[in-house]
Amino acid sequence: MLSIFKPAPHKARLPAAEIDPTYRRLRWQIFLGIFFGYAAYYLVRKNFALAMPYLVEQGFSRGDLGFALSGISIAYGFSKFIMGSVSDRSNPRVFLPAGLILAAAVMLFMGFVPWATSSIAVMFVLLFLCGWFQGMGWPPCGRTMVHWWSQKERGGIVSVWNCAHNVGGGIPPLLFLLGMAWFNDWHAALYMPAFCAILVALFAFAMMRDTPQSCGLPPIEEYKNDYPDDYNEKAEQELTAKQIFMQYVLPNKLLWYIAIANVFVYLLRYGILDWSPTYLKEVKHFALDKSSWAYFLYEYAGIPGTLLCGWMSDKVFRGNRGATGVFFMTLVTIATIVYWMNPAGNPTVDMICMIVIGFLIYGPVMLIGLHALELAPKKAAGTAAGFTGLFGYLGGSVAASAIVGYTVDFFGWDGGFMVMIGGSILAVILLIVVMIGEKRRHEQLLQERNGG
């Protein structure tokens, strides 16, 4: 691996008296680094959409621009997986800021170089590149969280961290307005968020650290005395990419089930998000400002929803991620049916449905990522999360744009909703299968430990 990305070497252990205060201070500091670092990736993820109306005025068709934008999702799905495998053998302190600076550089290029927005092919290639660098955001955060927080704390910490993308996702339109006020140039949609992202990358590098051992601290399991079922000394050894795949990812049946469930969770998440402005306008006769508010509320309702979901998965369901997912996905399916069946002319009900769906859907998105981290040993965590993300983006995101779009063209909005609701029912079934499988695996490990 490129030598700048090499994991930081383990240091001699600090004196016992210093371990607790150092651990506490570093955990806060590192959390700020991965929270704002990851939020900043969202500054340069969806900001191209803000420039699209101006590109339509230049004569590009909406369909073509949609195709160019899909470059981000396609590249991101692959990259999250491949970069996940690379990040399991890299220092997250260097890895996360590097990806952020590269993604921002692509956006600066698109903002300042006239031919970069001159053709669909060029835009697709540049957005594909940006999407590729975007994949360097999640895996180092996942690696950091499994090394610095123990299993019992992780649901809460992952759910707070997961709000970063809702926080980051809401900021680009504000930066764009600021840029328009200062420069009166629509390219500000591309370069304003990019400048901010670079500043945050420097902040993240200053705050983040690699493993506890690289700071002279004991592994988290020892510090918190919280060992997972299958923890042993081998869990601290770094693994090769081939070992990670062949031993822990490909043969892991439960990981395959949650990866496929992820396709259907993403189908609903992006199906509602991407199509709500069109649906609310065409079917529910919403004005532009109302449908924009609905979109904003959907994103921001995800914050309390994710926090509640993480808290419930730790405290109410006692770490049973499958059961929590079933609970939230069942409720979100009901909310989607109400949203679809509600007749035009009741805008309040539609707004409430958008808030409820946003509140409920981001929890399962977070849980599946967390669940993947826990189904694999911690040195394979990035690869496992990337594996489920690959399915989510390539299957779910692309299906949400293309399949839902074509279904609506041929069978009307009822057809589109049937696809999304059918998908979320399949997600519930798959999560029930995982729940049963986990219970069996847990009992088997207990038996081996007690009797074996």
Swiss-Prot record:
Recorded topology in the membrane: Multi-pass membrane protein
Cited Pfam families: MFS_1
GO terms under cellular component: plasma membrane
Coiled coil (residue ranges): none
SUPFAM superfamilies: MFS general substrate transporter (SSF103473)
Family: Belongs to the major facilitator superfamily. Organophosphate:Pi antiporter (OPA) (TC 2.A.1.4) family.
Subunit structure comment from the entry: Monomer.
Matches recorded under PANTHER family: GLUCOSE-6-PHOSPHATE EXCHANGER SLC37A4, GLYCEROL-3-PHOSPHATE TRANSPORTER
Name of the protein this chain belongs to: Glycerol-3-phosphate transporter
Organism of this sequence: Escherichia coli (strain K12)
Gene: glpT
